[in-house]
Amino acid sequence: PVDFRTVFDGTLAGGNLYHVVTMSDDGEAILDGFHIVNGNASTGSSVIKTGGGVLHEYGTLYIRNCMIENNVATNGAGIVMLGTTKKLVMTNTVVNNNTNTGLASESFYSAITLENDARLNHCTIIHNNAPGICAMNGQLRLYNSVLWGNTSTGTIAPEDIQITGEATTLDIRNNAIQNAPEEWNLWSENIQLSVVQGDPLYPAFVNPTRNVGAVSSGYDTPLGGPARFEPTCESPLVIAGDESIVGDPDLALDADITGHNFAVGGAPDIGAYEATCLNPVGSVLYVRSGPAGTASS
């Protein structure tokens, strides 16, 4: 989905679809390998002004290897689960540069709003104009994911909370998160990222977006073209993933959003992308000088 993109684009004749993707069936559906862009649920006659990218109304939805960006809504601009849903399972997915137009005090104020049963592994949630996740109720299982650079002010600051909500069951382990509520006590099992370039805990990427929130047209990247949130080799995300903590078969993975195998470098990276600057794990051959004909030489 990164190099050869299948795009669901909400732009129609100068306007926008309210929701680019809507899951309105009580069964199961899979979104795999799509670029979901340019939904706008914040204006017009939209009855539900949340979920510009994906509106999950009913049933169970699996989102795999997708990029959800540049969507707008009053709240929950990227993805919204409503209380009538069953389960959301999201893996190897990037949710970036989505914009909320509502007030920070309102419900659903986040790029991704979750209810009931939400499970995420190896996702990158970044540069959204709102906190990354609001887990409103139910349970949230979050592993090996990045939440960084999500802010309601437009300027990234250390105090920006990346994840909020009142979910009753939380299992949040081995993620890289900029900031979270103090009472959640996340830092013994997660990495706290820095916003200071040059800091060892600053997550540098190959070709990230420059700014926060949706853009009106074109690309907002230093190298041009679509954003690529692949970590550089100096990033704290590299070789920091841990698949052993994931007991849910729905979340099991062995490759990233590009199909790059986790064996590269010896362990997976945190987030949807694997760094491509590392060599695959191979055999180690030892060459010793002056063999003495003993078992040790």
Positions of PLM-derived features:
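Predominantly extracellular beta-rich ligand-binding scaffolds that present long acidic/polar faces
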Residues: P1-D3, I48, H56-E234, G247, ...
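Extracellular beta-strand-rich solenoid/capping regions of secreted or surface-exposed proteins
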Residues: P1-D32, V37-T60, M81-T84, P231-C233
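A short, flexible beta-alpha/helix-coil linker loop
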Residues: A41, S152-T153, P291-T294
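Right-handed parallel beta-helix/beta-solenoid
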Residues: L223, T276-S297
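Predominantly extracellular/luminal cell-surface or secreted proteins
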Residues: V37, W148, Q178, Y286-G290
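Active-site and glycan-interaction determinants of carbohydrate-active enzymes
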Residues: G33, N38-I48, L223-I270, L278
